[in-house]
Protein backbone atom coordinates (compact mmCIF):
# COMPACT_ATOMS: atom_id res chain seq x y z
CA UNK A 1 0.00 0.00 0.00
CA UNK A 2 1.39 3.41 -1.02
CA UNK A 3 0.36 6.63 0.67
CA UNK A 4 1.50 10.16 1.48
CA UNK A 5 1.85 11.94 4.81
CA UNK A 6 2.40 15.66 5.24
CA UNK A 7 5.39 16.07 7.56
CA UNK A 8 5.99 19.72 8.38
CA UNK A 9 5.71 20.84 4.79
CA UNK A 10 7.19 17.72 3.21
CA UNK A 11 4.61 15.54 1.44
CA UNK A 12 6.29 12.23 2.16
CA UNK A 13 5.58 9.09 0.14
CA UNK A 14 5.77 5.68 1.81
CA UNK A 15 4.63 2.08 1.54
CA UNK A 16 3.77 -0.55 4.14
CA UNK A 17 4.45 -4.28 3.88
CA UNK A 18 3.99 -7.27 6.17
CA UNK A 19 2.95 -7.75 9.77
CA UNK A 20 4.80 -7.80 13.07
CA UNK A 21 6.91 -5.30 14.97
CA UNK A 22 7.38 -1.97 13.22
CA UNK A 23 10.52 -1.60 11.12
CA UNK A 24 11.39 1.55 9.16
CA UNK A 25 13.68 1.07 6.16
CA UNK A 26 15.71 4.20 5.42
CA UNK A 27 17.02 4.09 1.87
CA UNK A 28 20.43 5.23 0.59
CA UNK A 29 20.88 8.79 -0.61
CA UNK A 30 21.41 10.31 -4.02
CA UNK A 31 19.28 11.75 -6.79
CA UNK A 32 17.59 8.76 -8.39
CA UNK A 33 18.00 6.62 -5.26
CA UNK A 34 14.95 5.71 -3.21
CA UNK A 35 13.08 2.82 -1.59
CA UNK A 36 13.46 0.76 -4.76
CA UNK A 37 17.02 0.12 -3.58
CA UNK A 38 15.60 -2.37 -1.04
CA UNK A 39 14.05 -4.61 -3.70
CA UNK A 40 16.18 -7.66 -2.80
CA UNK A 41 15.62 -7.15 0.93
CA UNK A 42 11.99 -6.20 1.35
CA UNK A 43 10.48 -9.68 1.08
CA UNK A 44 12.66 -11.21 3.77
CA UNK A 45 12.04 -8.33 6.16
CA UNK A 46 8.30 -8.09 5.49
CA UNK A 47 8.00 -11.80 6.28
CA UNK A 48 8.88 -10.95 9.89
CA UNK A 49 8.03 -7.27 10.40
CA UNK A 50 5.57 -4.51 9.54
CA UNK A 51 7.89 -2.63 7.21
CA UNK A 52 7.56 1.06 6.35
CA UNK A 53 9.55 2.49 3.43
CA UNK A 54 9.38 6.31 3.50
CA UNK A 55 11.16 8.25 0.78
CA UNK A 56 12.92 11.37 2.02
CA UNK A 57 12.71 14.91 0.64
CA UNK A 58 14.12 15.10 -2.89
CA UNK A 59 14.16 11.31 -3.27
CA UNK A 60 11.81 9.00 -5.14
CA UNK A 61 8.16 10.00 -5.07
CA UNK A 62 8.76 12.71 -2.44
CA UNK A 63 9.26 16.19 -3.90
CA UNK A 64 12.18 18.43 -3.11
CA UNK A 65 11.50 21.51 -0.98
CA UNK A 66 13.04 24.97 -0.82
CA UNK A 67 16.47 25.23 0.75
CA UNK A 68 19.31 22.77 1.23
CA UNK A 69 18.90 19.08 1.92
CA UNK A 70 20.54 18.31 5.27
CA UNK A 71 20.84 15.30 7.53
CA UNK A 72 19.30 17.35 10.32
CA UNK A 73 16.19 18.04 8.24
CA UNK A 74 15.88 14.41 7.17
CA UNK A 75 16.22 13.24 10.76
CA UNK A 76 13.43 15.63 11.78
CA UNK A 77 11.26 14.30 8.96
CA UNK A 78 11.90 10.73 10.09
CA UNK A 79 11.03 11.53 13.70
CA UNK A 80 7.77 13.08 12.51
CA UNK A 81 7.11 9.96 10.43
CA UNK A 82 7.60 7.73 13.47
CA UNK A 83 5.28 9.88 15.54
CA UNK A 84 2.49 10.36 13.01
CA UNK A 85 2.53 7.29 10.75
CA UNK A 86 4.15 4.50 12.77
CA UNK A 87 2.70 5.88 15.99
CA UNK A 88 5.51 4.70 18.25
CA UNK A 89 8.94 3.11 18.40
CA UNK A 90 10.33 1.01 15.56
CA UNK A 91 13.43 -0.85 14.51
CA UNK A 92 15.48 1.34 12.17
CA UNK A 93 17.41 -0.18 9.27
CA UNK A 94 19.28 2.46 7.30
CA UNK A 95 21.69 2.18 4.39
CA UNK A 96 24.30 4.80 3.46
CA UNK A 97 22.62 8.20 4.01
CA UNK A 98 19.73 6.31 5.57
CA UNK A 99 22.13 4.91 8.16
CA UNK A 100 23.22 8.41 9.11
CA UNK A 101 19.59 9.45 9.45
CA UNK A 102 18.89 6.39 11.62
CA UNK A 103 21.85 7.25 13.84
CA UNK A 104 20.63 10.81 14.34
CA UNK A 105 17.13 9.61 15.19
CA UNK A 106 18.55 7.12 17.70
CA UNK A 107 20.54 9.92 19.35
CA UNK A 108 17.66 12.38 19.50
CA UNK A 109 14.69 10.14 20.17
CA UNK A 110 15.62 6.90 21.94
CA UNK A 111 11.97 6.58 22.92
CA UNK A 112 11.13 6.03 19.24
CA UNK A 113 14.02 3.67 18.53
CA UNK A 114 14.17 -0.06 19.12
CA UNK A 115 17.13 -1.84 17.54
CA UNK A 116 19.19 -0.12 14.87
CA UNK A 117 21.04 -1.46 11.83
CA UNK A 118 23.56 0.93 10.26
CA UNK A 119 24.56 -0.33 6.81
CA UNK A 120 27.51 1.46 5.19
CA UNK A 121 26.86 4.77 6.90
CA UNK A 122 29.05 7.48 8.42
CA UNK A 123 28.88 9.64 11.54
CA UNK A 124 31.31 12.16 10.02
CA UNK A 125 31.84 12.98 6.37
CA UNK A 126 35.53 12.12 6.62
CA UNK A 127 34.47 8.48 6.90
CA UNK A 128 33.97 8.30 3.14
CA UNK A 129 36.67 7.21 0.73
CA UNK A 130 37.48 10.60 -0.88
CA UNK A 131 36.43 9.58 -4.38
CA UNK A 132 32.97 8.61 -3.11
CA UNK A 133 31.96 12.21 -2.37
CA UNK A 134 34.04 14.10 -4.92
CA UNK A 135 31.61 16.79 -6.17
CA UNK A 136 33.32 16.72 -9.58
CA UNK A 137 32.26 13.12 -10.14
CA UNK A 138 29.24 12.80 -12.41
CA UNK A 139 26.59 10.32 -11.19
CA UNK A 140 25.97 7.36 -13.52
CA UNK A 141 23.41 8.15 -16.22
CA UNK A 142 20.98 5.53 -14.93
CA UNK A 143 20.30 7.65 -11.83
CA UNK A 144 18.84 10.45 -13.93
CA UNK A 145 16.50 7.94 -15.57
CA UNK A 146 15.47 6.47 -12.21
CA UNK A 147 14.84 9.95 -10.83
CA UNK A 148 12.70 10.95 -13.77
CA UNK A 149 10.58 7.80 -13.54
CA UNK A 150 9.02 8.74 -10.21
CA UNK A 151 9.94 12.26 -9.09
CA UNK A 152 7.00 14.68 -8.93
CA UNK A 153 9.49 17.45 -9.74
CA UNK A 154 10.31 16.00 -13.16
CA UNK A 155 13.61 15.13 -14.77
CA UNK A 156 14.48 18.82 -15.18
CA UNK A 157 14.93 19.10 -11.39
CA UNK A 158 17.48 16.28 -11.26
CA UNK A 159 20.59 18.55 -11.42
CA UNK A 160 19.23 20.62 -8.54
CA UNK A 161 19.01 17.61 -6.23
CA UNK A 162 22.42 16.35 -7.40
CA UNK A 163 23.95 19.69 -6.41
CA UNK A 164 22.17 19.83 -3.05
CA UNK A 165 23.30 16.33 -2.09
CA UNK A 166 26.86 16.92 -3.29
CA UNK A 167 27.07 19.94 -0.99
CA UNK A 168 25.62 17.97 1.92
CA UNK A 169 28.00 15.06 1.50
CA UNK A 170 31.11 17.26 1.62
CA UNK A 171 29.95 19.06 4.78
CA UNK A 172 27.85 16.60 6.79
CA UNK A 173 27.49 14.80 9.10
CA UNK A 174 29.84 16.21 11.74
CA UNK A 175 29.40 13.99 14.78
CA UNK A 176 32.39 12.95 16.87
CA UNK A 177 33.06 9.36 17.88
CA UNK A 178 32.33 10.16 21.52
CA UNK A 179 28.86 11.44 20.54
CA UNK A 180 27.93 7.86 19.69
CA UNK A 181 28.20 6.89 23.34
CA UNK A 182 24.79 8.52 23.85
CA UNK A 183 23.01 5.92 21.70
CA UNK A 184 21.05 3.59 23.96
CA UNK A 185 19.72 1.18 21.33
CA UNK A 186 21.42 -2.10 20.56
CA UNK A 187 23.02 -1.47 17.17
CA UNK A 188 24.45 -3.53 14.32
CA UNK A 189 27.13 -1.88 12.17
CA UNK A 190 27.44 -3.44 8.69
CA UNK A 191 29.90 -2.58 5.94
CA UNK A 192 31.28 -4.17 2.78
CA UNK A 193 34.93 -5.20 2.83
CA UNK A 194 35.49 -2.95 -0.21
CA UNK A 195 33.08 -0.19 0.74
CA UNK A 196 32.97 3.54 0.02
CA UNK A 197 32.94 3.87 3.81
CA UNK A 198 36.41 3.13 5.13
CA UNK A 199 36.82 0.08 7.34
CA UNK A 200 38.55 2.29 9.88
CA UNK A 201 35.45 4.48 10.12
CA UNK A 202 33.15 1.48 10.44
CA UNK A 203 35.30 0.18 13.29
CA UNK A 204 35.27 3.61 14.93
CA UNK A 205 31.47 3.58 14.70
CA UNK A 206 31.35 0.14 16.31
CA UNK A 207 33.75 1.17 19.07
CA UNK A 208 31.91 4.42 19.75
CA UNK A 209 28.54 2.77 20.31
CA UNK A 210 28.01 1.33 23.80
CA UNK A 211 25.98 -1.71 22.70
CA UNK A 212 27.07 -2.65 19.20
CA UNK A 213 27.93 -5.55 16.95
CA UNK A 214 30.02 -5.40 13.78
CA UNK A 215 29.66 -7.25 10.48
CA UNK A 216 32.09 -6.91 7.57
CA UNK A 217 30.46 -8.62 4.59
CA UNK A 218 33.13 -10.30 2.45
CA UNK A 219 33.30 -9.77 -1.28
CA UNK A 220 31.00 -6.73 -1.32
CA UNK A 221 31.10 -3.00 -1.92
CA UNK A 222 28.81 -0.12 -0.92
CA UNK A 223 26.02 -2.11 -2.55
CA UNK A 224 26.32 -5.02 -0.14
CA UNK A 225 22.56 -5.34 0.42
CA UNK A 226 21.96 -6.06 -3.26
CA UNK A 227 25.22 -7.88 -3.94
CA UNK A 228 24.69 -10.53 -1.24
CA UNK A 229 21.05 -10.08 -0.21
CA UNK A 230 20.51 -13.55 1.22
CA UNK A 231 23.49 -13.23 3.55
CA UNK A 232 22.70 -9.65 4.55
CA UNK A 233 18.98 -10.30 5.06
CA UNK A 234 19.78 -13.25 7.32
CA UNK A 235 22.21 -11.23 9.42
CA UNK A 236 19.74 -8.37 9.82
CA UNK A 237 16.77 -10.59 10.70
CA UNK A 238 18.81 -12.57 13.22
CA UNK A 239 20.04 -9.38 14.88
CA UNK A 240 16.54 -7.94 15.13
CA UNK A 241 14.87 -11.10 16.42
CA UNK A 242 17.38 -12.69 18.80
CA UNK A 243 19.12 -11.68 22.00
CA UNK A 244 22.91 -11.47 22.30
CA UNK A 245 24.70 -14.68 23.15
CA UNK A 246 27.02 -14.99 26.13
CA UNK A 247 30.42 -15.18 24.44
CA UNK A 248 33.16 -17.51 25.67
CA UNK A 249 36.06 -15.06 25.76
CA UNK A 250 34.72 -11.49 25.88
CA UNK A 251 37.09 -8.54 25.65
CA UNK A 252 35.03 -5.48 24.79
CA UNK A 253 31.92 -6.99 26.35
CA UNK A 254 33.61 -8.21 29.53
CA UNK A 255 31.82 -6.99 32.64
Task: Pin down the residues of each PLM region.
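Active-site nucleophile elbow and catalytic-triad environment of alpha/beta-hydrolase enzymes
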Residues: 163-179
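Conserved alpha/beta-hydrolase "acid-adjacent" motif
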Residues: 196-201
Amino acid sequence: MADYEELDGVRTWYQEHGDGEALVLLHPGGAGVDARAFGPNLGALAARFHVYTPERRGHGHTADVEGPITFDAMARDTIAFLERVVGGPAHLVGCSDGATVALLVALRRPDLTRRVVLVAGVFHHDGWVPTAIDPDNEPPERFARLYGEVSPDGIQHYPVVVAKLAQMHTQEPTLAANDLNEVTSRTLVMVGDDDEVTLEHAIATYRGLPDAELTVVPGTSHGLLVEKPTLCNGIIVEFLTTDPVATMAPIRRAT
